[in-house]
Amino acid sequence: MAHKKAGGSTRNGRDSESKRLGVKRYGGQVVSAGEIIVRQRGTKFHAGVNAGMGKDHTIFAKETGRVKFEVKGPLNRKYVVIEPVA
């Protein structure tokens, strides 16, 4: 009778679900208060004027306005600023 040896097992075959990180609203776009601008791990972007940071480092708008990305300070940090719409 024909026999076939058992195939080996593997310890691979798993992957985590993607977290959908990144910039959600770009420079020049108008956002309303509470809207998420950037989802990130760590502080790639910092919260500037009229922007807040959640406990998972999400940057969100505190006021309705136009999104602006700025680089400033001695460490050349990237800030997200919301300029009020007149």
Curated annotation (Swiss-Prot):
Record Pfam families: Ribosomal_L27
InterPro entries, A to Z: Ribosomal_bL27, Ribosomal_bL27_CS
TM ranges: none
GO molecular function, one term: structural constituent of ribosome
GO CC terms in record: cytosolic large ribosomal subunit
UniProt keyword list: Ribonucleoprotein, Ribosomal protein
Domain of life (superkingdom): Bacteria
GO biological process, one term: translation
Disordered, as annotated region: 1-24
Disulfide partners: none
PANTHER family associated with the record: LARGE RIBOSOMAL SUBUNIT PROTEIN BL27M (PTHR15893:SF0), RIBOSOMAL PROTEIN L27 (PTHR15893)
Family label: Belongs to the bacterial ribosomal protein bL27 family.
HAMAP family, alphabetized: Ribosomal_bL27 (MF_00539)
Protein name: Large ribosomal subunit protein bL27
Lineage: Bacteria, Pseudomonadati, Pseudomonadota, Gammaproteobacteria, Oceanospirillales
Gene symbol of the encoding locus: rpmA
